[in-house]
């Protein structure tokens, strides 16, 4: 289903998760990996992030995963391809572990998103039968992440690049901005513009970001989409 070798391994894990159980707990595949896989593998993403915005369902998942079964609690029964290679660690922010597929480690996390509520995904919002965040919630969560860390060089401005590569219709992007602003106010648009300006003004920075994320699409195309993103949020 996916072209990149690491994404194929992520796809294997997705296909072995208990999709119905995760949906029942309002736990959705999100973050940069879900976006990269859904929008054409324009970059490589290495970790798996699931997101829950319901405290009751998060509590139930925390109890499930911190029990004796560990990750097996949310996997299909009798599977042999995925193994847990790190103890489950759970706190008020998330549930974290690492999985192995063919001796390749993959970080796995379920994050409690307490700032915005997620809408229920539709049938089109799936990867390997696993429900993902909707495009609206993917964008809103990326807008929040961008405000948190756009100036962190180690992040390589991936949040604004992900938003640009999604190519959301203007109306949907503005709806995502409004949703993110419920948590962070007008800093959402301000920080988005700052991130774009940083990419434009720091010589060679976009090249460095693209290299770090193994992006092979033309740089001119990335610039085109970043500039379109800025126009949408400043009109």
Predicted regions and their residues:
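Compositionally biased terminal segments of proteins
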Residues: 1-235
